[in-house]
Amino acid sequence: MKYIKLLIVFCLVFIPFKVLAVEDEDIISKAVSGILIDAESGKIIYEKNKDDQVAVASMTKMVAQIIILDEIEKGTIKWDDVITVSKNAADMGGSQIYIEEGEKITVEDLMKGISMASGNDAIVQMAEVVSGSEAKFVKRMNKKVKELGLKNTNFVNCTGLDEEGHYSSSYDMAVIARELVMNHPEILKFSSVYEDYLRENTDNKFWLVNTNKVVCKFMFYVIIILGRMM
């Protein structure tokens, strides 16, 4: 079977992504901005308002993942490194994997929580591991998008929580997603999985279900992080 090698970044304004039906025939008209590209060549197949600056929610985390995976590749951090959770990370709101202050957790489990559950607590913890603080990590994220030549992206946080001055475009997100998949295909071992567990062999087992419901139905697609752009 020939695998589909298309990377889809679609920006929805009228339909919250968590309740979007895959079969919705009106998905294109309800998207305020969107793009479809070939992940290998980068060729644009379809676009709608691709350069409009919009809020990108959890798709923000793709840039963070690139930076984290770069550090793993360099050996600065390792998959099996055990991290002690900070109060700052544990107190994060929004989507979470519910890590607790002082808890011990591996880099691999944090990345699993980021990729599958879009955990804000997990990404902030990894930002602190890599750069010492979220603020310093965000500076590195903005440096990365400039290196990629992106002109319609600026980050204020690493979570994607809505803040003034935090935005991107569907084109920029597609470039970021392509960079992630092509240079770090290992991310797919997390993002293409529909369900898994954290702390599986403990009394505090936590069930992870991928926030991207497309994973359950279309396993041939390159799946990254699904967010809602406004």
Indicate where each model-derived feature is located:
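Active-site-adjacent loops and short helices of periplasmic peptidoglycan-processing enzymes
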Residues: 21-171, 178-182
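A generic short-segment signal for beta-strand/edge and adjacent turn/coil regions
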Residues: 3, 52-55, 81-83, 92-94, ...
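Sec-dependent N-terminal signal peptides of Gram-positive bacterial secreted proteins and lipoproteins
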Residues: 3-21
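Domain-terminus/edge residues, biased toward the C-terminal soluble/receptor-binding domains
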Residues: 1, 150-154, 162-167, 171-230
